[in-house]
Structures are given as structure tokens and as C-alpha cells.
């Protein structure tokens, strides 16, 4: 338990940031799930739209510190590879 007022405030701030970050991570996962569903359906047009929606969302999360930039780049690269394979 935090004893000093500054430590108590730090605990409150961490809890608030955790909620925001959890929401951002969930939003990114939702966009990723929409992309996966479009791929599973075999619809290239909707998969492209889902990918174009997913990429800026994950990069926005990177800029906010939710994901590491290399982890996000890896996810984007893998999804782009799957999208390209769908068209071949």
C-alpha cells in the first residue's frame, strides 16, 4: 500500500493509464479480428479495407506507447503477407 500522498497519486495515475492502454490494445485487436474475418471469408476487397483500417490504428497505439514499434511492424508485415497471398 502506498504510504505517501505522492505514491497514492502515482497509484491512481497508473490505474488510469492502464485503463486507457487496455482500451487501445482492445481496439487494435478488434481491427485485427475484422481483418482475420475478411481473410477467412476470402473477400479480397473487404480484407484490403480492413488492413487499411488496421495499420493506422496499430501505429497510433505505437505512438502512444501501447505497443513497441518493432512488434507493430512485425504484425503489419505478417498481415500484409497474408493479404498478398490471398490475391495469388
UniProtKB/Swiss-Prot annotation:
One of the GO biological process terms: translation
GO-annotated cellular components: small ribosomal subunit
Q: Which SUPFAM superfamilies match?
A: Ribosomal protein S20
- Point out the coiled-coil segments of this chain: none
Among InterPro entries, the record links this protein to: Ribosomal_bS20 (IPR002583), Ribosomal_bS20_sf (IPR036510)
Instruction: Tell me which UniProt keywords the record has, alphabetically.
Output: Ribonucleoprotein, Ribosomal protein, RNA-binding, rRNA-binding
The record, for Gene3D superfamilies, names: Ribosomal protein S20
Q: Does the keyword Lipoprotein apply?
A: no
Q: Name one GO molecular function term.
A: structural constituent of ribosome
The organism sits in which domain of life?
A: Bacteria
Q: What does this protein do?
A: Binds directly to 16S ribosomal RNA.
Which family does the entry's similarity section mention? Belongs to the bacterial ribosomal protein bS20 family.
Q: Which HAMAP family match?
A: Ribosomal_bS20
**What's the protein called, per UniProt?**
Small ribosomal subunit protein bS20
